[in-house]
């Protein structure tokens, strides 16, 4: 790798990295990783794979469209009509483009798409070859170059995005934030993320024990062809439980049966083998039990052999299977043909769907039975459903490929239908008109916009929530949303197993960041250095194995399997090998040199089971580890020195991987390596814990995800506290992105004076938390001063708040567009006038300009009009001509939210996709911290503001420092957030020392003792306690108080957004009860439990007032004779009950309107509730 003279400069021992050096060196390695990969690389790579490979593959895989008209029998002799063949070939994708209404294309910039509610998508073109074959003439080929077939939404910052590869300066000129990571789509102006979906790995054999079922054990294999549109077909091989439901319990032991796709009943396993053409018992057993010297296993198979004794020929077996699958009443030949089809095409398609795959399928089926028997005999552990090696994650690539495949199929179907019409009339057809470009464009747009993943027509089968609106509250919440994983298990299931933190998640998934409540443990987040494979072709590996003396299944004698090692590639058994040790070494060497084998391929050698499994598929989660050989890191000082200079010498992370110093290890392979936690473990010790290390962690703090990496000293907190902070960190206010002033987000909170924390973790620099922080370093005292901070509330310094402490601004955008609803109904922006407009509200319309929009800088308050819009009323035919109507228009303006006030910040008028006038208005309001607002430290210690005291009323130290925030001492003991206290100490040291404190987890260099000693060097109390003086009296407070700087966050939950009360107001139409919810000025529900309390109190009048007078009072007239509601005309005072012919005996009854409604609904179902008045 290096020249000889270069090697000479570095003495071998001198080049080793010592543990002390590693403290800094590991962060250089990690920085190089993030410089190259960023935080959303897994999204971008997956999308690029889709665009560059999958789309072309899907188009090529589609069979050519073959069309021919029906033969015409008009002229006597039958002439063969011409055949038309359409083949789709090379595809082209252009850069994202927008066609204005006048038809001029222009490149579309992402920010323009956001502001104008466009979709950021690129046009897709394809070459089509059209061949016309007429009898007696030579065929005529026409090439249709670059035919437009639809638009594909483009992921921001991917290869085909216009922002790809631009410098920070260029990005700023395009109004884009250089820190924005990309990895999302823009659909109709809103940003959408594709959440990675978890699924079980396909083509792998699992064996599970069945509880409470007729089977004791089941082996399953979800078989699926690589890159194919066919759905997965699962095959189950099960062993019946002892003493099953069968009648003859004693006669036959535990039989083994298979459940085949499209076959209704289960089929005895031996019959399946005979149907595959393996007839003699010995042949079959050779494929199941490789070693005949194993009496236990032979016994297990005996019952199955006895059961299938009646069927000895292949055709009889096929007939047996066919009669259980085909429609009843078809001939024997048809049944046999059907069974052959099922066995060839539907059973284990990943082994092969062509002819002559019987041997391979028999071997694979035999392997499944073998695994089942091993599990039944207790020689091999059962598989674990929650093991992360058995899981795959579907990212943007596979998800979009699944969608595009369906859309493309529909497109071809439409082309065929369109062309057939013309051909049947004997005409030629126009290809451009035959292609409905809307199918692909709208199909992809629909799924990305709604999150229903699948065909729009079958919306109920589709998965929901795959695509979500990108969370833009804080920068951390955006990053975290782009790295989220979702398990599609029903949220209502109370299953604990899939929600638990599994051992295999170490380093792949963050242990702290998961939501609380019903989705806990089902929604996860990627750890910082985890990466998801995009998949590569297995063909080079298969060719390599052929060369390296792997014996193919077709060519071996079954006896050879017993002592050889089986080789699986992507779950498919491809052959056996006699020297696995050497083979694995060669494969590893190739992967480390990145020769033939891509670095993300994983190879597992299971020594005990004699198997080598190689995986190249997409969606495996993996992470980089340092390679150790002979107890020494392969990473040397020279690599570190080159990385330090990486701005100048272009030496990057990729070079580390290429030089075989670092490699990617996935969850399955991680179980076969020996991992050292730190290079310190590799040092020669008296008693070595292990002398066979193969890999070493880069840094243990990389097991955390985005939100947990912001927590200082998370290893000193009780674990649920870290989980709480991970959720709250997403609600903190800060600067969510640097171009917020040119964006029109529906909601946005921006803190006035955010500060970077005094106490940071090393991981923060990769999350850009220093550039875009979300909080303020506040002086925090822990005391119960005046007692206004009980129950998690905090006392705040009023003077600090007046100086701008935690002040924030809140932006809300309103949007509206003109449109034509019909030929006589059109909407226009204008200032409505009371003379011509119907339905104008009692609101102030004077603030509008003549164009119907409000001007920037105007102060607006609840229910003011911000966008004036009218819609023309349709003319009524029955009106006489000449009579001019009073109203010609109806008002449909947009009003400010009732509970908000603010200043109009920005008004934007433009044209949208359809060319209609379209406007967005942004209103800003200043939010000053007040009593009831929510704050939190970075340790899950949340609290609301209980009271604000002026600075002169706050306690002060002898140096004259007053705290900004006072929290209650009771918040600490039971919650055990020691990290909070250490952060405060470290912050005190940092403020004195003038440098940033390091609070990275699992860091032995920093501990409480060291921080305390530093603090006492500066003349403070060892543990941060100080003497405080009472602000009211000036006397010394008897106890010492813990005080120091702590980083606090302001959360988005503010009193102004929650305060709500109502006296009278709008009611629902159906039951005349008050509306629900603050936005509709609704009432407060007096529920069942409140009602029960009042009944227990015996407060009857109060109860009546709440549930009747204050809700929906109503009066009805009731006939005294039959008790049914009577007809009453209150104007003429005439009352009658038609049924009883009674006009006199009628009473007035008061009852809730909802009760009257119920009675009438019952009457409609011919149940008569009679109200007998007494």
Swiss-Prot record:
It is found in: Nucleus. The keyword Protein biosynthesis does not apply. Keywords: DNA-directed RNA polymerase, Hydrolase, Magnesium, Metal-binding, Methylation, Nucleotidyltransferase, Nucleus, Phosphoprotein, RNA-directed RNA polymerase, Transcription, Transferase, Zinc, Zinc-finger. Pfam families: RNA_pol_Rpb2_1, RNA_pol_Rpb2_2, RNA_pol_Rpb2_3, RNA_pol_Rpb2_4, RNA_pol_Rpb2_5, RNA_pol_Rpb2_6, RNA_pol_Rpb2_7. The lineage of its organism: Eukaryota, Metazoa, Chordata, Craniata, Vertebrata. Zn(2+) binds at residues 1119, 1122, 1137, 1140. GO terms for biological process: transcription by RNA polymerase II. SUPFAM superfamilies: beta and beta-prime subunits of DNA dependent RNA-polymerase. CDD domains: RNA_pol_B_RPB2. PROSITE patterns: RNA_POL_BETA (PS01166). The modification Phosphoserine is found at residue 937. Component of the RNA polymerase II (Pol II) core complex consisting of 12 subunits: a ten-subunit catalytic core composed of POLR2A/RPB1, POLR2B/RPB2, POLR2C/RPB3, POLR2I/RPB9, POLR2J/RPB11, POLR2E/RPABC1, POLR2F/RPABC2, POLR2H/RPABC3, POLR2K/RPABC4 and POLR2L/RPABC5 and a mobile stalk composed of two subunits POLR2D/RPB4 and POLR2G/RPB7, protruding from the core and functioning primarily in transcription initiation. Part of Pol II(G) complex, in which Pol II core associates with an additional subunit POLR2M; unlike conventional Pol II, Pol II(G) functions as a transcriptional repressor. It catalyses: RNA(n) + a ribonucleoside 5'-triphosphate = RNA(n+1) + diphosphate; a 3'-end ribonucleotidyl-ribonucleotide-RNA + H2O = a 3'-end ribonucleotide-RNA + a ribonucleoside 5'-phosphate + H(+). Mg(2+) binds at residue 792. DNA promoter binds at residue 409. Catalytic core component of RNA polymerase II (Pol II), a DNA-dependent RNA polymerase which synthesizes mRNA precursors and many functional non-coding RNAs using the four ribonucleoside triphosphates as substrates. Pol II-mediated transcription cycle proceeds through transcription initiation, transcription elongation and transcription termination stages. InterPro entries: DNA-dir_RNA_pol_su2 (IPR015712), DNA-dir_RNAP_su2_dom (IPR007120), DNA-dir_RNAP_su2_hyb_sf (IPR037033), RNA_pol_bsu_CS (IPR007121), RNA_pol_bsu_protrusion (IPR007644), RNA_pol_Rpb2_2 (IPR007642), RNA_pol_Rpb2_2_sf (IPR037034), RNA_pol_Rpb2_3 (IPR007645). RNA binds at residues 731, 841, 890, 942. Belongs to the RNA polymerase beta chain family. The keyword Endoplasmic reticulum does not apply. This is DNA-directed RNA polymerase II subunit RPB2. GO terms for cellular component: chromosome, telomeric region; mitochondrion; RNA polymerase II, core complex.
């Amino acid at each position: 790798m290096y020249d000889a003279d270069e090697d000479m400069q570095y003495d071998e021992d001198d080049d080793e990295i010592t543990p002390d050096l590693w403290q800094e060196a590991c962060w250089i390695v990690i920085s190089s990783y993030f410089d190259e990969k960023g935080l959303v690389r897994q999204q971008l790579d997956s999308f690029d794979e889709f665009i560059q490979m999958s789309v072309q593959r899907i188009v090529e895989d589609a069979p050519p469209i073959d069309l021919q008209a029906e033969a015409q029998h008009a002229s006597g002799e039958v002439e063969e009509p011409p055949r038309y063949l359409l083949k789709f070939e090379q595809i082209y994708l252009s850069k994202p483009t927008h066609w204005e209404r006048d038809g001029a294309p222009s490149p579309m910039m992402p920010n323009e798409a956001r502001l104008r509610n466009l979709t950021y998508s690129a046009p897709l073109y394809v070459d089509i070859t059209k061949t016309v074959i007429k009898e007696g003439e030579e065929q005529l080929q026409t090439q249709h170059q670059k035919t437009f077939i639809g638009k594909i939404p483009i992921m921001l910052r991917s290869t085909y995005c216009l922002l790809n590869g631009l410098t920070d300066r260029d990005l700023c000129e395009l109004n884009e934030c250089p820190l924005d990571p990309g990895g999302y789509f823009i659909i109709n102006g809103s940003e959408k993320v594709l959440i990675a979906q978890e699924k079980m790995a396909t083509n792998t054999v699992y064996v599970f024990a069945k509880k409470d079922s007729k089977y004791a054990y089941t082996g399953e294999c979800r078989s699926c062809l690589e890159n194919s549109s066919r759905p997965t077909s699962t095959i189950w091989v099960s062993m019946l439980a002892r003493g099953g439901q069968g009648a003859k319990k004693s006669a036959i032991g535990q039989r083994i049966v298979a459940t085949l796709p499209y076959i209704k009943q289960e089929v005895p396993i031996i019959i399946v083998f005979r149907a595959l053409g393996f007839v003699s018992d010995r042949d079959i057993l050779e494929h199941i039990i490789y070693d005949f010297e194993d009496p236990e296993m032979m016994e297990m198979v005996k019952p199955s052999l006895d059961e299938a004794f009646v069927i000895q020929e292949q055709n009889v077996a096929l007939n047996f299977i066919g009669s259980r699958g085909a429609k009843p009443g078809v001939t024997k030949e048809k049944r046999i043909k059907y069974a052959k089809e099922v066995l060839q095409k539907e059973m284990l398609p990943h082994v092969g769907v062509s002819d002559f795959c019987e041997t391979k399928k028999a071997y694979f089926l035999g392997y499944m039975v073998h695994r089942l028997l091993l599990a039944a005999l207790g020689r091999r552990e059962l598989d674990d459903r929650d093991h992360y090696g058995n899981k795959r994650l579907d990212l943007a690539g596979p998800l979009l490929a699944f969608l595009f495949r369906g859309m493309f199929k529909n497109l071809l179907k439409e082309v065929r239908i369109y062309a057939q019409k013309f051909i049947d009339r004997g005409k030629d057809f126009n290809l451009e008109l035959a292609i409905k470009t809307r199918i692909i464009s709208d199909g992809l747009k629909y799924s990305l916009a709604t999150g229903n993943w699948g065909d729009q027509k079958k919306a109920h089968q589709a998965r929901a929530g795959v695509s979500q609106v990108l969370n833009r509250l804080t920068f951390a919440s955006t990053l975290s949303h782009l790295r989220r994983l979702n398990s599609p298990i029903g949220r209502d299931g109370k299953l604990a197993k899939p929600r638990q933190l599994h051992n295999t998640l170490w380093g792949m998934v963050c242990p702290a960041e998961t939501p609380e409540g019903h989705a806990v443990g089902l929604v996860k987040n990627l750890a910082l250095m985890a990466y998801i494979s995009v998949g590569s072709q297995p063909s080079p590996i298969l060719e390599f194995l052929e060369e390296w003396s792997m014996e193919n299944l077709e060519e071996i004698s079954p006896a050879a399997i017993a002592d050889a090692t089986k080789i699986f590639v992507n779950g498919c058994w491809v052959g056996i090998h006699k020297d696995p040790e050497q083979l694995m070494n060669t494969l590893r060497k190739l992967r480390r040199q990145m020769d033939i084998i891509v670095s993300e391929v994983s190879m597992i050698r299971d020594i005990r089971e004699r198997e080598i499994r190689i995986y190249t598929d997409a969606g495996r989660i993996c992470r980089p580890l340092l390679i150790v050989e002979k107890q020494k890191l392969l990473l040397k000082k020279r690599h570190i020195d080159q990385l330090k200079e990486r701005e100048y010498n272009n030496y990057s992370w990729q070079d580390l991987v290429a030089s075989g110093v670092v490699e990617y290890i996935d969850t399955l392979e991680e179980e076969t390596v020996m991992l050292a936690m730190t290079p310190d473990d590799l040092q020669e010790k008296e008693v070595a814990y292990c002398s066979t290390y193969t890999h070493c962690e880069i840094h243990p703090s990389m097991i955390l995800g985005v939100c947990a990496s912001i927590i200082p000293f998370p290893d000193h907190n009780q674990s649920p506290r870290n989980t709480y902070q991970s959720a709250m960190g997403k609600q903190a206010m800060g600067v969510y992105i640097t171009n917020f002033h040119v964006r029109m987000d529906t909601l946005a909170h921006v803190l006035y004076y955010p500060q970077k924390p005094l106490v940071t973790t090393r991981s923060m620099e990769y999350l850009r938390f220093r550039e875009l922080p979300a909080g303020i370093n506040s002086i925090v005292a822990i005391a119960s001063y005046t007692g206004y901070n009980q129950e998690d509330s905090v006392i705040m310094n009023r003077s600090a708040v007046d100086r701008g402490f935690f002040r924030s601004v809140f932006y809300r955008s309103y949007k509206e567009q003109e449109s034509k609803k019909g030929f006589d109904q059109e909407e226009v922006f204008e200032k409505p006038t009371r003379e011509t407009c119907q339905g104008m509200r009692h609101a102030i319309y004077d603030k509008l300009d003549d164009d119907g929009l409000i001007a920037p800088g105007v102060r607006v308050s609840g229910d003011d009009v911000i966008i004036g819009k009218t819609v023309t009323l349709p003319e009524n035919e029955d009106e006489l001509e000449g009579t001019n109507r009073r109203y010609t228009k109806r008002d449909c303006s947009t009003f400010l939210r009732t509970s908000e006030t603010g200043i109009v910040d920005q008004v934007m008028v433009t044209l949208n996709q359809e060319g209609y006038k379209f406007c967005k208005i942004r209103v800003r309001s200043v939010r000053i911290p007040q009593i009831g607002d929510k704050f939190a430290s970075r340790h899950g210690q949340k609290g609301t503001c209980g009271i604000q005291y002026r600075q002169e009323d706050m306690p002060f130290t002898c140096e004259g420092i007053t705290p900004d925030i006072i929290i209650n001492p009771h918040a600490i003991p039971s919650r055990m957030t020691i990290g909070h206290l250490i952060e405060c100490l470290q912050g005190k040291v940092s403020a004195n020392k003038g440098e940033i404190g390091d609070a990275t987890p699992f860091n032995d260099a920093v501990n409480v003792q060291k921080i305390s000693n530093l603090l006492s060097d500066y003349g403070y109390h060892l543990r941060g306690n100080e003497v405080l003086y009472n602000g009211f009296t000036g006397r010394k407070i008897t106890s010492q108080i813990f005080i120091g700087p702590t980083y606090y966050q302001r959360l988005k939950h503010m009193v102004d957004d929650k305060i709500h009360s109502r006296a009278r107001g709008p009611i629902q139409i159906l039951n005349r009860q008050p509306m629900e919810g603050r936005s509709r000025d609704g009432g407060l529900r007096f529920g069942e439990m409140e009602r029960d309390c009042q009944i227990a109190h015996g407060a009857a009048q109060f109860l009546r007032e709440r549930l009747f007078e204050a809700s929906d009072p109503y009066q009805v007239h009731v006939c005294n004779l039959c008790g049914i509601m009577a007809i009453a005309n209150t104007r003429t005072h005439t009352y009658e009950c038609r049924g009883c012919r009674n006009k006199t005996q009628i009473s007035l009854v008061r009852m809730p309107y909802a009760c009257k409604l119920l009675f009438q609904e019952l009457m409609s179902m011919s149940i008569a509730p009679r109200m007998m008045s007494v």
